[in-house]
Swiss-Prot record:
Protein name, entry field: DNA-directed RNA polymerases II and V subunit 6B
Superkingdom field: Eukaryota
InterPro entries, sorted: DNA-dir_RNA_polK_14-18kDa_CS, Pol_omega/Rpo6/RPB6, RPB6, RPB6/omega-like_sf, Rpo6/Rpb6
Database matches in Pfam families: RNA_pol_Rpb6 (PF01192)
Alphabetized UniProt keyword annotations: DNA-directed RNA polymerase, Nucleus, Transcription
Organism in which the protein naturally occurs: Arabidopsis thaliana (Mouse-ear cress)
NCBIfam families (alphabetical): PRK01099.1-3
Family to which the UniProt record says this protein belongs: Belongs to the archaeal Rpo6/eukaryotic RPB6 RNA polymerase subunit family.
BP-aspect Gene Ontology terms: DNA-templated transcription
Recorded coiled-coil stretches: none
Amino acid sequence: MADDDYNEVDDLGYEDEPAEPEIEEGVEEDADIKENDDVNVDPLETEDKVETEPVQRPRKTSKFMTKYERARILGTRALQISMNAPVMVELEGETDPLEIAMKELRQRKIPFTIRRYLPDMSYEEWGVDELIVEDSWKRQVGGD
C-alpha cells in the first residue's frame, strides 16, 4: 500500500547527473604564474611561529605565582605522583601525593612551565623554579 503512493516518483535524478570533468591541476596554476610574474609577493607570516631559541625579553607579568597557578601545579603534579611518576625529592615518610607535590614545590623541583597569556594573545613562559611562591603558611619560597 505504501508503494502505491510513490508510483513514478522513485527516480530522484541522482543517476542522470553528468560526471564532473577532471581538471588538470598544473595547467591553470602555470597560467596564473605567467600572468603574475612581475608582482612581488612576500610570504605571509603566521601567528604560529616556531622559535628555535627562546628570546629573553623583559617580562611584563608578575614574578609571583598566583594561587590559581599554584593550585593547578600542585594538583597536576599530585596526579602524576599518584600514577607512579618519579618523585624529584627525598621522601621522609610522606605517602600523600599532594604532600609530596608541596614538598617538591617548596624545594623548587617541579619541572613545569607556566604559560601566561597576555591581552594581545602573546604569552610569557615562566619556569616554576623562576617564580616566587607563597605557600599556605604565608612563607615566601624562592625568588631573587
